[in-house]
Amino acid sequence: MLILGIETSCDETGIALYDGVENKIIFESLFSQADKHSLYGGVVPELAARDHTNKLLPLLKKGLDDSNMSLKNIDAIAYTKGPGLRGPLMVGSAFAKSLGFALDVPVIPVHHMEAHLLMAKYDAPQLKYPFLTLLVSGGHTILAKVESSGAVSYTHLTAAD
Protein backbone atom coordinates (compact mmCIF):
# COMPACT_ATOMS: atom_id res chain seq x y z
CA MET A 1 0.00 0.00 0.00
CA LEU A 2 1.44 3.36 -1.05
CA ILE A 3 0.43 6.30 1.13
CA LEU A 4 1.02 9.91 0.13
CA GLY A 5 1.79 12.09 3.13
CA ILE A 6 1.17 15.85 3.13
CA GLU A 7 2.54 18.19 5.82
CA THR A 8 1.58 21.88 5.98
CA SER A 9 1.22 22.61 9.69
CA CYS A 10 3.51 25.65 9.75
CA ASP A 11 6.10 27.04 7.34
CA GLU A 12 7.49 23.95 5.65
CA THR A 13 5.73 22.16 2.81
CA GLY A 14 6.34 18.42 2.91
CA ILE A 15 5.28 15.62 0.59
CA ALA A 16 6.31 11.97 0.89
CA LEU A 17 5.29 8.64 -0.57
CA TYR A 18 5.51 5.73 1.86
CA ASP A 19 5.36 2.02 1.06
CA GLY A 20 3.53 0.42 3.98
CA VAL A 21 4.32 -3.12 2.86
CA GLU A 22 8.08 -2.59 2.53
CA ASN A 23 8.15 -0.04 5.40
CA LYS A 24 10.18 2.41 3.34
CA ILE A 25 9.95 5.93 2.02
CA ILE A 26 9.76 6.02 -1.78
CA PHE A 27 10.37 9.77 -1.95
CA GLU A 28 10.21 12.81 0.26
CA SER A 29 10.28 16.45 -0.77
CA LEU A 30 10.48 19.47 1.48
CA PHE A 31 10.29 23.20 0.83
CA SER A 32 11.31 25.48 3.69
CA GLN A 33 10.05 29.03 4.05
CA ALA A 34 12.45 29.85 6.91
CA ASP A 35 14.37 32.52 5.00
CA LYS A 36 11.18 34.35 4.01
CA HIS A 37 9.77 34.38 7.54
CA SER A 38 13.06 35.37 9.18
CA LEU A 39 12.55 38.81 7.64
CA TYR A 40 9.47 39.22 9.88
CA GLY A 41 10.88 37.74 13.09
CA GLY A 42 8.52 34.78 12.96
CA VAL A 43 6.09 32.85 10.80
CA VAL A 44 3.41 34.92 9.04
CA PRO A 45 0.51 32.46 8.65
CA GLU A 46 -0.95 34.07 5.51
CA LEU A 47 2.41 33.98 3.71
CA ALA A 48 2.96 30.39 4.82
CA ALA A 49 -0.45 29.34 3.47
CA ARG A 50 0.23 31.04 0.12
CA ASP A 51 3.58 29.29 -0.24
CA HIS A 52 1.98 25.92 0.53
CA THR A 53 -0.58 26.62 -2.20
CA ASN A 54 2.22 27.35 -4.68
CA LYS A 55 4.55 24.49 -3.70
CA LEU A 56 2.38 21.40 -3.05
CA LEU A 57 1.74 20.43 -6.67
CA PRO A 58 5.32 21.03 -7.92
CA LEU A 59 6.75 19.05 -4.98
CA LEU A 60 4.34 16.18 -5.68
CA LYS A 61 5.14 16.20 -9.40
CA LYS A 62 8.90 16.22 -8.77
CA GLY A 63 8.67 13.39 -6.25
CA LEU A 64 6.56 11.24 -8.55
CA ASP A 65 8.80 11.95 -11.55
CA ASP A 66 12.04 11.28 -9.65
CA SER A 67 10.72 7.96 -8.30
CA ASN A 68 9.09 6.82 -11.58
CA MET A 69 5.70 6.74 -9.88
CA SER A 70 2.38 8.23 -10.93
CA LEU A 71 -0.78 9.37 -9.20
CA LYS A 72 -2.29 5.99 -10.13
CA ASN A 73 0.13 4.29 -7.70
CA ILE A 74 -1.31 6.13 -4.67
CA ASP A 75 -3.58 3.96 -2.49
CA ALA A 76 -4.34 6.51 0.25
CA ILE A 77 -3.51 10.07 1.29
CA ALA A 78 -2.62 11.17 4.81
CA TYR A 79 -2.41 14.83 5.79
CA THR A 80 -1.68 16.85 8.90
CA LYS A 81 -4.97 17.87 10.52
CA GLY A 82 -3.30 19.70 13.42
CA PRO A 83 -2.03 21.09 15.61
CA GLY A 84 -0.61 23.93 13.57
CA LEU A 85 -1.46 27.24 11.95
CA ARG A 86 -5.05 27.41 10.72
CA GLY A 87 -4.35 28.77 7.20
CA PRO A 88 -1.54 26.38 6.34
CA LEU A 89 -3.53 23.44 7.74
CA MET A 90 -6.53 24.39 5.59
CA VAL A 91 -4.36 24.44 2.46
CA GLY A 92 -3.00 20.95 3.17
CA SER A 93 -6.45 19.62 4.01
CA ALA A 94 -8.02 21.02 0.84
CA PHE A 95 -5.19 19.68 -1.31
CA ALA A 96 -5.39 16.20 0.26
CA LYS A 97 -9.18 15.98 0.08
CA SER A 98 -9.32 17.25 -3.51
CA LEU A 99 -6.63 14.84 -4.66
CA GLY A 100 -8.25 11.99 -2.74
CA PHE A 101 -11.59 12.74 -4.37
CA ALA A 102 -10.02 12.90 -7.83
CA LEU A 103 -8.15 9.61 -7.31
CA ASP A 104 -11.01 7.93 -5.41
CA VAL A 105 -8.71 6.91 -2.54
CA PRO A 106 -9.15 7.21 1.24
CA VAL A 107 -7.99 10.44 2.88
CA ILE A 108 -6.67 10.11 6.43
CA PRO A 109 -6.33 13.07 8.83
CA VAL A 110 -3.25 12.71 11.05
CA HIS A 111 -2.51 14.37 14.40
CA HIS A 112 0.87 16.02 13.88
CA MET A 113 2.27 15.30 17.35
CA GLU A 114 1.06 11.68 17.41
CA ALA A 115 2.81 11.13 14.09
CA HIS A 116 6.04 12.36 15.68
CA LEU A 117 5.48 9.98 18.60
CA LEU A 118 5.00 7.02 16.28
CA MET A 119 8.25 7.70 14.40
CA ALA A 120 10.01 5.74 17.16
CA LYS A 121 8.38 2.61 15.72
CA TYR A 122 9.46 3.52 12.17
CA ASP A 123 13.06 4.13 13.25
CA ALA A 124 13.15 0.96 15.39
CA PRO A 125 10.70 -1.59 13.92
CA GLN A 126 11.72 -4.15 16.55
CA LEU A 127 10.22 -1.89 19.24
CA LYS A 128 7.27 -3.67 20.87
CA TYR A 129 4.00 -2.11 22.02
CA PRO A 130 3.43 -0.65 24.51
CA PHE A 131 6.37 1.76 24.76
CA LEU A 132 7.08 5.14 26.33
CA THR A 133 8.25 8.00 24.16
CA LEU A 134 9.28 11.60 24.70
CA LEU A 135 8.68 14.34 22.15
CA VAL A 136 10.11 17.85 22.33
CA SER A 137 9.04 19.76 19.22
CA GLY A 138 8.59 23.51 18.96
CA GLY A 139 6.25 24.52 21.77
CA HIS A 140 5.13 20.95 22.45
CA THR A 141 6.58 18.57 25.03
CA ILE A 142 4.90 15.20 25.37
CA LEU A 143 5.65 12.10 27.41
CA ALA A 144 3.32 9.39 26.19
CA LYS A 145 2.60 5.70 26.42
CA VAL A 146 1.96 4.27 22.97
CA GLU A 147 -0.30 1.20 23.17
CA SER A 148 -0.62 0.79 19.39
CA SER A 149 -0.56 2.94 16.27
CA GLY A 150 -4.05 4.18 17.13
CA ALA A 151 -3.87 4.35 20.92
CA VAL A 152 -1.70 6.94 22.66
CA SER A 153 -2.16 8.00 26.28
CA TYR A 154 -0.49 11.19 27.38
CA THR A 155 1.42 11.01 30.65
CA HIS A 156 2.69 14.61 30.62
CA LEU A 157 1.84 17.31 28.11
CA THR A 158 2.74 20.94 27.47
CA ALA A 159 1.75 22.90 24.38
CA ALA A 160 2.53 26.17 22.66
CA ASP A 161 0.13 28.99 23.47
Show which residues each predicted segment covers.
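N-terminal beta-alpha supersecondary unit
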Residues: 2-83, 112
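Short glycine-aspartate micro-motif
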Residues: 3-5, 78, 88, 131-135
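Short beta-strand scaffold segments in enzyme catalytic cores
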Residues: 13-18, 133, 141-145
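A structural microfeature
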Residues: 27, 153-154
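Short Gly/Thr/Asp-enriched flexible loops that form oxyanion-binding sites at enzyme active sites
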Residues: 79-103
